[in-house]
């Protein structure tokens, strides 16, 4: 069960794109503080955040500083090294879990997961080269 995150808490968002911006705007309206972590400064989400952290997703010191500044963490895009989320999960709650990121990082895993759970998806085939594409 997910523990309730009370207004006034600081939510950390990994990624600074438009989705993070919309999330941050909604979270702030509900009374939360928002910190973002993004590779590039002045990101769309960073522009509306209470605090923006900038650095590589492999910069352990910068990630640690970000993690220490928040109560709970989420992510807004899938191009984050899974190991980073695994490390963060040992320090702070992270939602969704890193397993979700792993599934979303490739369309093959994403579609296979959804199909296995019984969700209706369009037929698909995974191809790795031109010969497999011709056969598909």
What is each of the regions a protein language model found here?
Residues 1-105, 109:
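ATP-binding N-terminal substructure of ATP-dependent carboxylate-amine bond-forming enzymes
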Residues 103-136:
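Active-site nucleotide/adenylate-binding loops and adjacent lid/helix of ATP-dependent enzymes
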